[in-house]
Regions:
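Second-shell loop/turn segments in exported
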Residues: 54-61, 82-88, 115-116, 147-149, ...
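Metal-dependent phosphoester-hydrolase catalytic domains
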Residues: 153, 210-224, 232-352
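Structured beta-strand-rich core segments of catalytic domains in phosphoester-bond hydrolases
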Residues: 33, 91-176, 180, 184
Length: 352
């Protein structure tokens, strides 16, 4: 075979594989990690239940088991490829992220992360993990929770990051991607008693996304992904009315698209279970531009899923069926994963 033919074959191989890589789905996921604490005492915080001498007797052995459980689930969810973006909540600090993404087989996927220490009284915050194989970080910041009717109450920040594609010159990655990670106020004090605080978080998120849309150049529709544990179902007022996030079958002018708005083809009953009822608190919501398949990265139709590997579940002997294999239930240690299942969608680029 002469040199010209060899070079031609090599060029064809490179072009073919580049196009294929650009059109492989990019998985975007979210997971509530449930109390992902390190085992060390933090003298700057008043909450130290998750330490060796604390109420939960959180030892190094238990921490490493939790970490290893999480990396196995993430590898399974990503099908052993790098996730494009993984939003997380209930993350204590940089140490647990470094341990998870630099000291396990996840290290091969070239992840980086974003975490800001926030006002949560337990010291747990949202985080964004992203693959340098897929995205470059442009900027990040947090938007604090603020309720003018109850200024004494503090809740978790909303984490924001702006990305461009790792290969910004390619058609598949030409667009900017805006990502918001949420962990709205819990129902711990009662659903009705706390509905206003979640509506407040929804209003903050809506205002921030609207500001991105308004500031965009004429004729350009920003691609925004909102994800998180909203502590409300898709039809609850905070999500449906305040954020105005609707299932694609219920869209109205000015609405965002809740890809988890109905349990229609999501692959599982819900993301968390209360007695006999599965609910979808963990959701991924997008602006209409993410659904536009004419240019750049866009939603792969039908890809929204609740990830539920068998090893993340166990038999529910009280309420029947399956339940989540958790790390703790109250003070009792079980050595499992989380009290939430992760969710994901796939984005795909245009063929050239």
């Amino acid at each position: 075979m002469n040199k010209t033919l060899v070079l031609l074959c090599f060029a064809c191989f490179v072009i073919t594989n580049t196009v294929f890589a650009q059109n492989e789905p990019v998985r975007i996921a979210f997971w509530n990690m449930e109390n992902f604490f390190d085992p060390f005492v933090d003298s700057t915080k008043t909450y130290n239940a998750f330490t060796e001498d604390g109420m939960q007797h959180w030892t190094k052995t238990r921490f490493y088991r939790k970490r290893n459980n999480m990396y196995k689930a993430i590898l399974a969810m990503s099908e052993n490829r790098p996730l494009g973006i993984l939003g997380m909540c209930e993350v204590e600090n940089e140490y647990v992220l470094s341990s998870l993404f630099e000291q396990t087989p996840l290290k091969k996927h070239n992840y980086r992360w974003i975490l800001y220490e926030g006002p949560d009284n337990r010291g747990i915050d949202p985080a964004i993990v992203y693959s340098l194989d897929h995205f470059q970080l442009v900027e990040s910041m947090v938007f604090p929770y603020y309720n003018p009717e109850d200024t004494a109450y503090h809740s978790r920040d909303i984490l924001y990051a702006k990305f461009i594609g790792a290969d910004a010159s390619s058609v598949a990655y030409a667009d900017t991607l805006h990502v918001f990670v949420n962990h709205w106020p819990s129902r711990y004090s009662g659903e009705l008693e706390t509905v206003g605080s979640r509506s407040c978080s929804a209003a903050i998120l809506r205002a921030k996304v609207d500001s991105i849309v308004v500031a965009a150049p004429e004729g350009y529709q920003p691609k925004v992904i909102m994800m998180g544990d909203l502590n409300d179902c898709p039809t609850d007022p905070s999500v449906y009315d305040v954020l105005r996030a609707r299932h694609p079958s219920e869209l109205e002018e000015g609405c965002f698209i809740n890809l988890f708005g109905k349990n229609d083809g999501l692959g599982f009953e819900g993301t968390l279970k209360h007695q006999t009822d599965w609910q979808i608190f963990d959701q991924i919501i997008v602006t209409p531009a993410v659904m536009d398949d004419r240019e750049g990265l866009h939603y792969k139709e039908g890809s929204a899923r609740i990830f539920h590997a068998d090893f993340m579940l166990e038999d529910d002997e009280t309420y029947h069926g399956k339940k989540l294999f958790r790390t703790y239930i109250g003070p009792r240690y079980f050595g499992g994963f989380s009290d939430h299942l992760p969710v994901y969608i796939d984005l795909i680029g245009n063929e050239e």
